[in-house]
From Swiss-Prot:
Domain of life from the UniProt record: Bacteria
Gene, per the UniProt record: rplB
Record SMART domains: Ribosomal_L2, Ribosomal_L2_C
Family: Belongs to the universal ribosomal protein uL2 family.
Coiled-coil region list: none
The protein's name: Large ribosomal subunit protein uL2
Record SUPFAM superfamilies: Nucleic acid-binding proteins, Translation proteins SH3-like domain
Subunit details: Part of the 50S ribosomal subunit. Forms a bridge to the 30S subunit in the 70S ribosome.
InterPro entries xref list: NA-bd_OB-fold (IPR012340), Rib_uL2_dom2 (IPR014722), Ribosomal_uL2 (IPR002171), Ribosomal_uL2_bac/org-type (IPR005880), Ribosomal_uL2_C (IPR022669), Ribosomal_uL2_CS (IPR022671), Ribosomal_uL2_dom3 (IPR014726), Ribosomal_uL2_RNA-bd_dom (IPR022666)
Pfam families: Ribosomal_L2, Ribosomal_L2_C
Keywords from the named record: Ribonucleoprotein, Ribosomal protein, RNA-binding, rRNA-binding
Length: 276
């Protein structure tokens, strides 16, 4: 999908870019696959802010996505490629021959009219989902399961992909987008291909108001807060941090400090750590 640039008719448009949405084939989603989505504004069930910088934004409806890809042996045809406001990737509506309709993540180069299939016997074609044990070494995949039957959890963002590196017993070696090499159960499923809409990362928001349309509230620097609000706060004028390293609002070291738990159970599945 190409990036659309604008003439600098206003300061907000000067550096603004958008998708040209050339791949999108319809603006009317499938009603049977929509669900209501209530805004949380970053609050938990007590009304306390647990995620900062969230709130407002345009009203959305949730699109029910088939991450499990468990409709084995039944071919389906791509009916539409659609925009999804809840994720960076586009989605594809699949019409199966038994009459059922499902949304899947739209891989790169998937087009209307193409056929997709799930199951161990599926061909190695873009959009097909099958167990990792049946996918040849070197194949690019996405939407990878961590537990069989739970549904894809890894590599779902726009433009991302992973690669099958090898097979070791009941596990398969997979290199993720971050560079991390990880062992995944061979019975877990993945979808062949790279996630589409790879130009998403090149979009420039351009103005503050557009961030608000997306439900993103302003991020205030800690150095301009009071000491009660942030470890960087206080002082006369533009005071330095006054600490060994930058801190999070909760007093933890940040900017390079590793936050992963030391003895996490899944450490034994990580063959090589991700790149910085």
């Amino acid at each position: 999908m190409a990036i659309k640039k604008y003439n600098p008719t206003t300061n907000g448009r000067r550096n603004m870019t958008t998708n040209d949405f050339a791949e999108i084939t319809t603006d009317r989603p499938e009603k049977s696959l929509l669900a209501p989505l209530k805004k949380k504004a970053g609050r938990n069930n007590q009304g306390k802010i647990t995620v900062r910088h969230q709130g407002g934004g345009h009203k959305r409806q949730y699109r029910i996505i088939d991450f499990k890809r468990n409709k084995d042996g039944i071919p389906g045809r791509v009916a539409t490629i659609e925009y999804d406001p809840n994720r960076s990737a586009n989605i594809a509506l699949i019409n199966y021959v038994d009459g059922e309709k499902r949304y899947i993540l739209a891989p790169k180069n998937l087009e209307v009219g193409m056929e997709v299939m799930s199951g161990p016997e599926a061909d190695i074609k873009i959009g097909n989902a099958l167990p990792l044990m049946n996918i040849p070494v070197g194949t690019v995949v996405h939407n990878i399961e961590l537990k069989p039957g739970r549904g894809g959890q890894l590599v779902r963002s726009a433009g991302t992909s992973a690669q099958v590196l090898g097979k070791e017993g009941k596990y398969v070696l997979v290199r993720l987008t971050s560079g991390e090499v990880r062992l995944v159960l061979a019975t877990c499923r993945a979808t062949v291909g790279q996630v589409g809409n790879e130009s998403h990362e090149l979009i420039k928001i351009g103005k503050a108001g557009r961030s608000r349309w997306l439900g993103k509230r302003p991020t205030v620097r800690g150095s301009v807060m009071n000491p009660v609000d942030h470890p960087h706060g206080g002082g006369e004028g533009r005071a330095p941090i006054g600490r060994k390293s930058p801190m999070s609002p909760w007093g933890k070291p940040t900017l390079g400090f590793k936050t992963r738990k030391k003895n996490k159970a899944s450490d034994k599945f990580i063959v090589r750590r991700r790149k910085k």
